[in-house]
Amino acid sequence: MVDANTSLQELFDIVVKTLDDVNAGEVFIVKELFRGFEWNRIGKSNRTKLGSMVFAYANGDEGSAVLEPLDKTPQNQQKYKKL
């Protein structure tokens, strides 16, 4: 269960695990990998840091085989495509 005390590493692990449920070719933002009320429980600074972690993962050796960073939304949220 996600709450204000959930560590960044735990949040990142949730993202990586949830990617299994995303179909290849689907475009998404990190926020969509969490239920609405869970995302709202994560502090703004941790949401920003989590976004940076996912972006680094997508550009790294392991993540680049799974995710492709795309452009950003008008709200400046990074979009990704599942490979």
Predicted ranges, named:
Residues 26-36:
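Short acidic, hydrophobic short linear motifs in intrinsically disordered regions
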Residues 1-3, 36-40:
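Charged, low-complexity surface segments at secondary-structure and domain boundaries
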Residues 8, 38-53, 66:
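Short, positively charged loop/turn segments that connect secondary-structure elements
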Residues 1-9, 18, 72-83:
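Phospho-regulated, low-complexity intrinsically disordered regions of nuclear gene-regulatory
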Residues 32, 56-83:
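Charged low-complexity interaction tracts in eukaryotic proteins
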Residues 6-27, 40, 56-59:
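Positively charged, polyanion-binding regions of nucleic-acid-associated proteins
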